[in-house]
Structure formats: structure tokens, C-alpha cells
């Protein structure tokens, strides 16, 4: 956005300027678009500075000083995850930048952006939000520095974090700024974290071990994490406090979950679903979500490696069927729409309108998970409203196909055979994404995932249903390598399972320790904070590379690593010419595509 655009709107200045590490796309899958539209709906003038040049001071002042505040986010993804691979190598592309160009955002973008803003504007309130700020709101282990870092509020000259999804919270905060309150006095809004020098007025709070303790004592870190994790419930979560060397971090309880009407109001806003017209190149991240629909937020799966618990929460917040149908009718009018809805879902597709009766009054259970180790008997597993929704979407003129691109939680789907039949009949595009993640019980327990036996039962039922329907449809399983709890023996067990599946696995993700997840706590401390038991953690680069190579043992480029792993584990029985062998005794030739000769 430029000052010329402000003039075209008849504005002399903005009320709020949002600074983002992503290119600007006016689509509800992009957080900046949602926050901007919500603030606009509330009557505020909102400007957006997307991917500012941090070497040019004027990049942050091109819209002038906003009347109320700057809002700062790294974008949809943590900037360190966006910039580096799981093995800390610099990425060569960026899906959230025009033309897939890398290096359009700095490392630790939120901190850098806040510093740049403060260089020019000494007193303007700076509010941070999004994944990077939310998940770094307390002292946290940083994989890229391999150390415990302070809260992002202690490192950056920001005044507040609006953590979680944040729509209601940011409107409340900006509204109070408009009414003349100082940002330092706004300390009572749910879903915010702020810094202070004293906590004398606070009551009913829990104090976490301080920064010095958690940065020098791994047991203290695990204790702090467990308390933090357990208190992320909007109904029983307490205010949390953590002392840092020069400040005190205070997190208010999480925001209450949005009602269906509130969800509808957010997604009914007039998103264009296009990038800003100034871009001459495509934004790759838009391709996969252009014709997708968000039906709900939150996930009660509780996977240890996933940040959704700390960001969106475990409670499902669903839109109404009418709101979803309105969005789809609007979507069909876009000239690029060819009749296919690529996805209707959320973090996982099959939790729409699900939950249990106690959650809306008492919160989620403290001492157990909804799906691990088995689905809870109190959980509503009836997918009938989702089935009705999928059927109604197919009736919308112009819609030819409705697919589930976000994947399903297979152990939940197994609780409702009618749903499984329905998606196999109408909503699978030929391949269904599911995530068993691993086969070893050591690892699936550390992940809080069901056993591989549950996955095998699902595969059997899926094949049975497709055979009955006369369809040839497949499963794309997703696996994680080098997760805490995984030993070399476990990695080989997974490789043997992949061998027995009979087809090559491409969907392999190296475990990346991201802030504020249970898995990251185990990675750093070597302990499970809930049991106190030690957890084996594969940390060396070579070991992590071996574990991944074992999963893709058919790739000739992985031969040396696979052979080394098998010899190290005393599994030479898997080297040979037998049908159960992973590799042959002789290294295969590596095919290289012929390159173009230099002129």
C-alpha cells in the first residue's frame, strides 16, 4: 500500500498500519487479510506494509505514522521456519513471496520489524501477533540458536502480543487506544501478553520459573512448559507470569472461543481472494488455498509436535452451513474458478461441529486427550452435520467437485463409518492424506498419536469401502523422521513398514523443533514433562539425515547413509538381494539429468 492509495481513499492517515513478512493476499487463509478486514469492519482505517526492505528506513514510514498503533507479524509462518530447512540450511524459495523469491523477510522478522519501527517512531504503540510472536511469548527453546531465548517482548521494543487468532482481541485493544487509553494501561484483555516492571496489582496468577532458571536448568524448563501448556484453556486458564532480567512477562488467560455467529461474521467479510494488484508475479501459497474453504478452527487431536494447541486451541469453532455456502457461491463467480473446491476443512477436515458437552462450560480435560490413546467415549463423533454440509456444497450451481485437501484424522473417521463411506464416494480426489507419523510405539506415544495398529485398521477399512464402491483410490501417508523418542532401531522399523507398504514414500518431514510445542520441550530437555521420564532425542545432523534416508531408502542418493545406519544397528540382514532387504550390497549408479552446456 502506498500514500497514493491513501489519497485515493480520501484518507490523510491510517489508524493502524500492519507490517507483515508475507506478500499481501486478500484471502481468509492469510492472517493479515483477516485482521485487516476485521479492523476495517470495526471502523478503523488500516494500511498494510508487506515485506518491507529492512535496509531502507523509509520502508516503514511510507504510510506515515498511524494514529493509533503499528501491528507487526512475521506472516503466516515463523520467519525461521520460513527461511531455513529442518537441518538449518537456508531455503531457496518462499511460498509467501512473489515469484517464490527467497530472502524477502529477515530472520526473526517480528523483532527486526519492531526495532525498525521504533527507530523512527519513538512512542507509537507496537502490537505484535501471528504465529512467531504468539509462540515466543515466554522464554522458549530456539532451535536455530540452540539455546533458550527470552520472550519476544523482552527482545523486541513491542508493547503487547495479541496471541492466538486474535480478531476480537485486536479490535478490543485498538478500540481502547482510540478511546484514549495508554497501551501500558491495557492489561486486562484476554488473549494478550504484555510486559511490566511490577506485578503488585495482579491476583490469582501462576508464576512460572524465571528466565534464569529455565535457561540453565532443563528440569525447570520442563516444569515451566507443563504449566504453560496446561493453562492454555479459556475457561480455567490462569494469568501466567515469568520474570526476565529486565522485565516481567504477563500472559492473560486465552480469549474465549468464537461463537458460530462470530466465525460467520469474520468469513463473510468482502475478501477479494486476490493478491495486491502491485504484484507482477504469482504468490505460490495462494495456489493451494485459492478455492479452499475454512469450515472450522482448532483441533482436539493434541499431537505433541503441533503448534495448534498453543495458537488456535483445542476447542472446535465452526462456521454455519449458510456462511460456508455464501462463500462458495461468491467463489463460483470468480473467472478462474473451474468447478472444484479443493478443500473444506481446518487443521483437519473431519472435526467440523464436533466436541463434547463439557467443553463450553468447563473447558477441555486437563488430565487426558480427546483422541489419545483412544477416542474418548464422551466425544461427539457424529459427522452427520459435516455430511450434510458436503452434500449441500455439491448442489451449488457451478460446483462440480468437492474434495478434502487438508486430510483427516483417521482414528476419528473410524468412529463414523457413514462419514467414511461418504468421503470415499464423493470427496476423495483419488488420494486421501492421512498422518500415521510413525510405527514405533515409543515414538507414537511421544507424539500423542494412536498406535500403528489403528492406522492399519483404517487402511483396511478404506480399501474395503473403495472396493465395494468400485473405486481405485489411494492413501498418502505422512511420516515424521527424527522425532524425540525415535532411536535407530525405531527408524529401521519404520523403514521396514514402508517397504511392506509396497510403494515409495515422498511425504517425509524431518522433525523441526518449533517454539511452544510439547515435542520441542522433549527435544531440548530430554524429558517428557508429564511423566518426568527421559526421552531419547536424535540430535546430530548425521543421525537425523540417516533417519530420513531410511524412510527413502530406494533413492540411490541415500544409499551410503542407509548402509551406514544398517551396519551401525547390526542389521546387515537388510543388505542383500532378498525381498526383505532394503538395499543391495553394491552401491547403485546415481542418475543425473543431463545439464545444458555452457555456450
UniProtKB/Swiss-Prot annotation:
A Pfam short name: Radical_SAM_N
Keywords (A to Z) from UniProt: 4Fe-4S, Iron, Iron-sulfur, Metal-binding, S-adenosyl-L-methionine
Gene3D superfamilies: tm_1862 like domain
Residues annotated for [4Fe-4S] cluster binding in this entry: 299, 303, 306
Cofactor: [4Fe-4S] cluster
Domain of life: Archaea
Occurrences of domain Radical SAM core (ranges): 281-557
Cofactor binding mode and count: Binds 1 [4Fe-4S] cluster. The cluster is coordinated with 3 cysteines and an exchangeable S-adenosyl-L-methionine.
Listed GO MF terms: 4 iron, 4 sulfur cluster binding; catalytic activity; iron ion binding
NCBIfam families the UniProt entry points to: SAM_YgiQ
Family named by the database record: Belongs to the UPF0313 family.
Protein name, UniProt field: UPF0313 protein UNCMA_01890
